[in-house]
Amino acid sequence: DPLFIFQLTHSGELSHPDFSKRVCIKPLAGFGGEVIGEDEIMAIMDKFVTAAKIAYDSGADGVDLKFCHGYLGSQILRPYNDGDWKYGGPWEKRRQFAFDMVERVRKAIPDKDFLIGSKISMWEGFPGGQGSAGPDTAIIDLTEPLDLAKGIEERGASFVIQSAGSPSITLALSQPDKAVPDQVYLHHTFQKALRDELKPETVVIGSAYSVFNDGNNKLQARNKEENTTFFWGNKNIKDGVVDMIALG
Protein backbone atom coordinates (compact mmCIF):
# COMPACT_ATOMS: atom_id res chain seq x y z
CA ASP A 1 0.00 0.00 0.00
CA PRO A 2 1.17 3.57 -0.64
CA LEU A 3 2.68 5.46 2.28
CA PHE A 4 1.99 9.12 2.95
CA ILE A 5 5.06 10.87 4.38
CA PHE A 6 5.39 14.59 5.11
CA GLN A 7 8.64 16.42 4.41
CA LEU A 8 9.47 18.82 7.24
CA THR A 9 11.98 21.62 6.75
CA HIS A 10 12.89 25.22 7.49
CA SER A 11 14.40 27.20 4.63
CA GLY A 12 16.75 29.31 6.75
CA GLU A 13 19.00 31.37 4.48
CA LEU A 14 16.97 30.22 1.46
CA SER A 15 13.68 31.64 2.74
CA HIS A 16 11.89 33.99 0.37
CA PRO A 17 11.01 37.25 2.15
CA ASP A 18 7.54 37.20 0.61
CA PHE A 19 6.86 34.01 2.56
CA SER A 20 9.09 33.96 5.63
CA LYS A 21 12.01 35.81 7.15
CA ARG A 22 15.42 34.84 5.81
CA VAL A 23 17.63 33.72 8.70
CA CYS A 24 21.01 32.06 9.09
CA ILE A 25 23.44 30.84 11.71
CA LYS A 26 26.51 32.13 9.83
CA PRO A 27 26.19 34.35 6.74
CA LEU A 28 27.10 32.57 3.50
CA ALA A 29 28.29 34.70 0.59
CA GLY A 30 25.35 35.57 -1.65
CA PHE A 31 22.72 34.47 0.86
CA GLY A 32 22.94 35.65 4.47
CA GLY A 33 19.88 36.76 6.38
CA GLU A 34 19.30 37.70 10.00
CA VAL A 35 21.69 35.78 12.23
CA ILE A 36 19.78 33.75 14.82
CA GLY A 37 21.04 32.01 17.93
CA GLU A 38 20.36 29.05 20.15
CA ASP A 39 17.03 30.27 21.53
CA GLU A 40 15.59 30.74 18.04
CA ILE A 41 16.89 27.33 16.92
CA MET A 42 15.28 25.63 19.92
CA ALA A 43 11.97 27.35 19.11
CA ILE A 44 12.22 26.14 15.52
CA MET A 45 12.84 22.60 16.76
CA ASP A 46 9.68 22.88 18.88
CA LYS A 47 7.77 23.70 15.70
CA PHE A 48 9.24 20.67 13.91
CA VAL A 49 7.93 18.47 16.70
CA THR A 50 4.51 20.14 16.54
CA ALA A 51 4.41 19.66 12.77
CA ALA A 52 5.28 15.98 13.15
CA LYS A 53 2.45 15.54 15.68
CA ILE A 54 0.02 17.26 13.30
CA ALA A 55 1.12 14.89 10.54
CA TYR A 56 0.60 11.91 12.83
CA ASP A 57 -2.81 13.10 13.99
CA SER A 58 -3.80 13.66 10.35
CA GLY A 59 -3.12 10.02 9.52
CA ALA A 60 0.27 10.34 7.84
CA ASP A 61 2.57 7.32 7.91
CA GLY A 62 5.70 9.26 8.77
CA VAL A 63 7.91 12.30 8.36
CA ASP A 64 11.07 13.06 6.41
CA LEU A 65 13.27 15.50 8.33
CA LYS A 66 15.18 17.33 5.63
CA PHE A 67 18.89 17.57 6.35
CA CYS A 68 19.67 18.47 2.76
CA HIS A 69 19.60 20.95 -0.12
CA GLY A 70 20.87 23.99 1.76
CA TYR A 71 17.93 24.27 4.16
CA LEU A 72 18.40 25.08 7.84
CA GLY A 73 19.27 21.50 8.75
CA SER A 74 22.07 21.55 6.18
CA GLN A 75 23.25 24.93 7.38
CA ILE A 76 23.69 23.59 10.91
CA LEU A 77 25.32 20.30 9.86
CA ARG A 78 27.87 21.87 7.48
CA PRO A 79 31.53 22.23 8.49
CA TYR A 80 30.99 25.91 7.55
CA ASN A 81 29.01 26.19 10.81
CA ASP A 82 32.20 26.58 12.84
CA GLY A 83 30.98 29.00 15.51
CA ASP A 84 31.12 28.30 19.23
CA TRP A 85 27.54 27.49 20.22
CA LYS A 86 25.31 24.54 21.14
CA TYR A 87 25.17 23.11 17.61
CA GLY A 88 28.28 24.66 16.09
CA GLY A 89 31.98 23.92 15.70
CA PRO A 90 33.12 20.28 16.10
CA TRP A 91 31.12 17.58 14.31
CA GLU A 92 30.03 16.11 17.64
CA LYS A 93 28.14 19.33 18.36
CA ARG A 94 26.79 19.91 14.85
CA ARG A 95 25.40 16.40 14.49
CA GLN A 96 23.61 16.71 17.82
CA PHE A 97 21.05 18.99 16.16
CA ALA A 98 19.85 16.12 13.98
CA PHE A 99 20.12 13.57 16.77
CA ASP A 100 18.08 15.75 19.13
CA MET A 101 15.49 16.34 16.42
CA VAL A 102 14.94 12.64 15.76
CA GLU A 103 14.82 11.84 19.47
CA ARG A 104 12.32 14.61 20.17
CA VAL A 105 10.00 13.54 17.35
CA ARG A 106 10.13 9.91 18.46
CA LYS A 107 9.45 10.88 22.09
CA ALA A 108 6.46 12.96 21.00
CA ILE A 109 5.17 10.14 18.78
CA PRO A 110 6.08 6.80 20.42
CA ASP A 111 4.01 4.82 17.89
CA LYS A 112 6.64 2.59 16.23
CA ASP A 113 4.47 2.33 13.11
CA PHE A 114 5.02 6.04 12.50
CA LEU A 115 8.10 6.26 10.29
CA ILE A 116 10.88 8.76 10.87
CA GLY A 117 13.59 9.29 8.29
CA SER A 118 15.66 11.92 6.60
CA LYS A 119 16.82 13.16 3.22
CA ILE A 120 20.55 13.86 3.45
CA SER A 121 22.84 15.75 1.11
CA MET A 122 25.90 13.52 1.15
CA TRP A 123 28.06 16.19 -0.50
CA GLU A 124 26.89 19.71 -1.26
CA GLY A 125 29.74 20.38 -3.68
CA PHE A 126 31.08 23.70 -2.40
CA PRO A 127 33.63 24.70 0.27
CA GLY A 128 32.30 24.09 3.75
CA GLY A 129 29.17 22.29 2.56
CA GLN A 130 27.88 18.98 3.87
CA GLY A 131 30.23 16.13 3.07
CA SER A 132 33.24 18.43 2.73
CA ALA A 133 36.50 17.84 4.58
CA GLY A 134 36.40 21.21 6.35
CA PRO A 135 34.91 24.71 6.51
CA ASP A 136 37.02 26.06 3.65
CA THR A 137 37.38 23.10 1.29
CA ALA A 138 35.09 21.26 -1.12
CA ILE A 139 37.09 18.01 -0.99
CA ILE A 140 34.69 15.10 -0.50
CA ASP A 141 34.80 13.41 2.91
CA LEU A 142 31.81 11.20 3.68
CA THR A 143 32.79 10.64 7.31
CA GLU A 144 30.23 13.10 8.66
CA PRO A 145 27.20 12.24 6.47
CA LEU A 146 27.71 8.53 7.08
CA ASP A 147 28.01 9.12 10.83
CA LEU A 148 24.87 11.26 10.63
CA ALA A 149 22.96 8.45 8.93
CA LYS A 150 24.11 5.88 11.48
CA GLY A 151 23.30 8.21 14.36
CA ILE A 152 19.73 8.91 13.31
CA GLU A 153 19.28 5.19 12.59
CA GLU A 154 20.31 4.42 16.18
CA ARG A 155 17.72 6.94 17.38
CA GLY A 156 14.81 5.46 15.47
CA ALA A 157 15.07 6.49 11.83
CA SER A 158 13.93 3.68 9.55
CA PHE A 159 14.79 5.21 6.16
CA VAL A 160 17.36 7.51 4.60
CA ILE A 161 16.85 9.26 1.28
CA GLN A 162 20.20 9.90 -0.41
CA SER A 163 20.67 13.22 -2.12
CA ALA A 164 23.49 15.61 -2.93
CA GLY A 165 24.10 19.24 -3.71
CA SER A 166 22.25 22.39 -2.79
CA PRO A 167 19.94 23.46 -5.65
CA SER A 168 20.55 27.16 -5.02
CA ILE A 169 24.32 26.67 -5.30
CA THR A 170 25.14 23.37 -7.05
CA LEU A 171 22.00 22.61 -9.06
CA ALA A 172 23.70 20.29 -11.57
CA LEU A 173 24.85 18.09 -8.68
CA SER A 174 21.52 18.09 -6.90
CA GLN A 175 19.45 17.58 -10.05
CA PRO A 176 21.56 16.25 -12.94
CA ASP A 177 19.84 17.21 -16.20
CA LYS A 178 19.88 15.68 -19.66
CA ALA A 179 22.26 18.32 -21.01
CA VAL A 180 24.94 17.78 -18.34
CA PRO A 181 24.01 14.49 -16.66
CA ASP A 182 27.42 13.10 -15.72
CA GLN A 183 27.23 13.79 -11.99
CA VAL A 184 24.43 11.24 -11.67
CA TYR A 185 27.06 8.55 -11.09
CA LEU A 186 28.22 10.36 -7.94
CA HIS A 187 24.76 9.71 -6.54
CA HIS A 188 25.24 5.96 -7.08
CA THR A 189 28.52 6.15 -5.17
CA PHE A 190 26.85 7.94 -2.26
CA GLN A 191 23.98 5.45 -2.25
CA LYS A 192 26.34 2.47 -2.03
CA ALA A 193 28.26 4.13 0.80
CA LEU A 194 25.03 4.49 2.78
CA ARG A 195 23.82 0.98 2.01
CA ASP A 196 27.13 -0.50 3.15
CA GLU A 197 27.07 1.49 6.41
CA LEU A 198 23.49 1.01 7.61
CA LYS A 199 21.58 -1.97 8.96
CA PRO A 200 19.85 -4.21 6.38
CA GLU A 201 16.44 -3.25 7.74
CA THR A 202 17.05 0.49 7.28
CA VAL A 203 15.71 1.46 3.86
CA VAL A 204 18.08 3.43 1.62
CA ILE A 205 16.28 5.36 -1.13
CA GLY A 206 18.34 6.68 -4.04
CA SER A 207 17.84 9.98 -5.86
CA ALA A 208 18.63 11.45 -9.29
CA TYR A 209 17.30 8.57 -11.38
CA SER A 210 14.88 10.71 -13.38
CA VAL A 211 17.71 12.03 -15.56
CA PHE A 212 18.05 8.61 -17.21
CA ASN A 213 14.41 8.66 -18.31
CA ASP A 214 13.99 6.54 -21.45
CA GLY A 215 17.65 6.72 -22.45
CA ASN A 216 17.38 10.07 -24.23
CA ASN A 217 20.22 11.79 -22.40
CA LYS A 218 23.80 12.76 -23.15
CA LEU A 219 25.54 10.15 -21.06
CA GLN A 220 28.33 8.59 -23.09
CA ALA A 221 29.83 5.10 -23.39
CA ARG A 222 26.53 3.28 -22.78
CA ASN A 223 23.99 1.75 -25.10
CA LYS A 224 20.69 3.61 -24.99
CA GLU A 225 18.79 0.63 -23.60
CA GLU A 226 21.28 0.47 -20.72
CA ASN A 227 20.90 4.14 -19.91
CA THR A 228 17.29 4.30 -18.75
CA THR A 229 15.69 4.88 -15.36
CA PHE A 230 14.23 1.37 -15.52
CA PHE A 231 17.63 -0.20 -16.22
CA TRP A 232 19.62 1.66 -13.57
CA GLY A 233 16.90 1.46 -10.92
CA ASN A 234 16.59 -2.30 -11.29
CA LYS A 235 20.34 -2.82 -11.54
CA ASN A 236 21.17 -0.82 -8.43
CA ILE A 237 18.43 -2.49 -6.40
CA LYS A 238 19.60 -5.93 -7.56
CA ASP A 239 23.25 -5.09 -6.88
CA GLY A 240 22.52 -3.88 -3.35
CA VAL A 241 23.29 -0.23 -4.04
CA VAL A 242 19.83 0.92 -2.87
CA ASP A 243 16.58 -0.59 -1.67
CA MET A 244 14.28 1.82 -3.53
CA ILE A 245 14.62 4.77 -5.90
CA ALA A 246 12.93 8.16 -5.75
CA LEU A 247 11.36 9.69 -8.85
CA GLY A 248 10.16 13.22 -9.32
Residue ranges of predicted features:
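Flavin-dependent oxidoreductase catalytic cores
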Residues: 1-247
